[in-house]
């Protein structure tokens, strides 16, 4: 399964090792991680490995905001894909809280220690996939948000010796939107959330709302 858009190719899902038996995926509630969950499940299904390979989603949420919409969206995303014919390899999500001071600083990602402990020490995952993508041309991410440089992004897509893999590290949100269109995943797309404001509707002003509109032609939920 090779993903393509505008001359750019992502072949990670075609080439990921057949011997991987336990794959962790951090589901943030956003469009990137939801697509990774879908594509991984689809690849396992197409390889006829449903009885051999398991996907272990994790959902993290701020202990200070346990009812944050992203927490609930993450659960909805997992359930939606689980219920598809391709979703039988997806296990129920592991939910855990975190505090802003509980960030893993031992590597170049922001995975939480609790997720690492669960996925590697308890489950024994072969790898963990994350939905980091490139930003928008000409509009840098806000100060303080994770924005790796080109060299780091390329390194993230390499599998050997790296625990956390970022399949979409070298593509932007327009590539992601094109895949949702290709697979006919409008309902799943509208379920995901980009806005960082915890409210019932997208703010349309934050960087992530602008990125969403730039790529999808609409805000969260298909809002214009």
Where are these regions (language model features)?
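Nucleotide-activated chemistry modules centered on ATP-dependent adenylation/adenylyltransferase
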Residues: 1-224
């Amino acid at each position: 399964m090779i993903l393509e858009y505008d001359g750019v190719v992502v072949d990670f899902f075609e080439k990921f090792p057949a011997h991987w038996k336990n794959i962790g995926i951090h589901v943030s509630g956003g469009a990137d991680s939801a697509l990774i969950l879908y594509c991984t499940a689809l690849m396992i299904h197409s390889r006829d490995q449903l009885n051999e390979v398991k996907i272990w989603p994790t959902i993290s949420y701020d202990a200070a905001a346990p009812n944050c919409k992203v927490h609930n969206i993450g659960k909805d995303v997992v359930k939606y894909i689980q219920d598809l014919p391709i979703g039988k390899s997806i296990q129920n999500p592991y939910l855990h809280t975190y505090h802003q001071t509980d960030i893993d600083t031992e590597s170049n990602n922001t995975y939480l220690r609790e997720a690492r402990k669960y996925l590697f020490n308890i489950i024994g995952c072969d790898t963990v996939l994350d939905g980091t993508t490139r930003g928008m041309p000409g509009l840098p991410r806000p100060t303080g948000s994770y924005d790796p440089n080109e060299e780091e992004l390329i390194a993230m897509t390499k599998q050997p010796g790296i625990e956390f893999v970022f399949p979409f590290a070298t593509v932007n949100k327009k590539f992601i939107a094109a895949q949702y269109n290709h697979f006919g995943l409008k309902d799943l797309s509208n379920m995901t959330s980009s806005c960082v404001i915890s409210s019932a509707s997208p703010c349309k002003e934050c960087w992530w709302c602008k990125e969403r509109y730039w790529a999808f032609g609409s805000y969260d939920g298909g809002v214009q």
